Amino acid sequence: MTSAIGFALGLLVFAENQNAGDQVTVLRNVAVLDGTGRAVQQNQDVTIKGDRILSIKAASSVVPKGARVVDLAGKTIMPQLINSHGHLGLLKGTTMSSANYTEDNIRAQLLRYEAYGVGAVLVLGTDHDEIFGLREASRKGTLPGAAIYTAGKGFGVKDALPPLSFGMDQVFRPLTEAEARNELRQLAAKKPDVVKIWVDDLWGTLPKMKPEIYAGIIQEAHRHGLRVASHVFYLEDARKLVGSGLDIIAHSVRDAEIDDPLLAEMKKRKVAYIPTLSLDEFAFAYQNDPQWLNSPFFQAALEPGVLQMITSAEYKEKVRKNPNTAKEVSALQVALKNVKRIHDAGILLSMGTDSGAQPIRVQGFSEHMELELLVKAGLTPLQAIATATKNAAALLKVDDRYGTLAPGKKANFIVLDKDPSTDILNTRTISAVWKNGEKVNEGPLATLAKAN
């Protein structure tokens, strides 16, 4: 399925004029969800010049002379989503391997993300050095699909996380603080967007990164003007990491409720939080048949063979018998409580999914599932969407151009058949994706139908 999507999208992207220049386009009679969290503005005319939004005004009969007019009556537009925790290249079919890490595979995954309305992905720690050239092409506009942001090679632990069995054999695994600092300096020369570390013992089964090593990485990163994001599970690890200067908690705290002192310290230090709720949902959901299993929107995102894998009796039984399955169910419940506490405390909450790190963490679909889970946690649909638009752009430090729909911002948005402010599932009603003032695809379902 996905190879067909990638091929069709690639043709469409290159068929479109990627540099619209002075072309003026008016989107008529459209509802605008601007990504800031405020209410949807009905019956608007959005004027675009080149790749930027020129104005958003109440609909009228007057349009600029020579403008291209696109009637979007009955539609809603919203900013493209930004995934602030994803992975590229390692996944192919039902396998995770560094052998899968090729330019063709990365390109196909970027196009898949874009078809699902994901305009950018921050890859946290599992990239090879080739990613920096692709990132440069992405920023120049010569690489179609979602924009690349990357931590390059992350920092893990020898014989521990991240797992070698998932193709994550390229990361640094320092044994001493001095080694960690030296490797950080090597990484800094490549100018990653952030630095990624793993601090977790996988339910007490593996060695965990030593505090002196992660403290050294954080200090050295800050010396080079780089922020650090950490894989985390336990409350006490989060507390120690924040005390050591961590900038981004890249997963939910899932063993205990985040207490007021840590919330206050996070807010004081401006620590961001990426909950990746869908990660835990997917860990146990397929022991039965989840409600989304037969959804074309879900199935179109799957790598070949994954649907057969997750619907097999063997796989279901494997999940049911896994002693960690019950722990994952409990972990998600704790995560849901914590994400609401983080949001209510005014801490920067940024949508991320860990999609692409396993075959069941589906690129494109996961980002919409994450929004659904954020609403389940107690956020309104508009608040949930803001974590994936305004907030995620702020985390990437690109909110001067991306993340919201406003005059002067990039004309990058999703066209929806239904208003997601009334039902978060409506983010899945994608009829088109626009980038730099031009339509680049018609959503995953239409693209798949054309490819077939």
Segments from the language model and where they lie:
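Short, acidic/polar
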Residues: 102-110, 173-187, 232-239
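Metal-associated gating/positioning segment near the N- to mid-region
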Residues: 76-140, 158-165, 212, 236-248
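Active-site gating/metal-coordination segments in enzymes
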Residues: 162-219, 248
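Acidic, glycine-enriched loop/beta-strand segments at the rims
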Residues: 32-45, 57-59, 333, 362, ...
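Divalent metal-dependent hydrolysis catalytic cores, especially in the metallo-beta-lactamase
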Residues: 108-131, 145-153, 192-203, 227, ...
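Active-site neighborhoods of metal-dependent hydrolases
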Residues: 182-205, 253-377, 451-452
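Histidine-rich, glycine-flanked metal-binding segment
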Residues: 32, 36-78
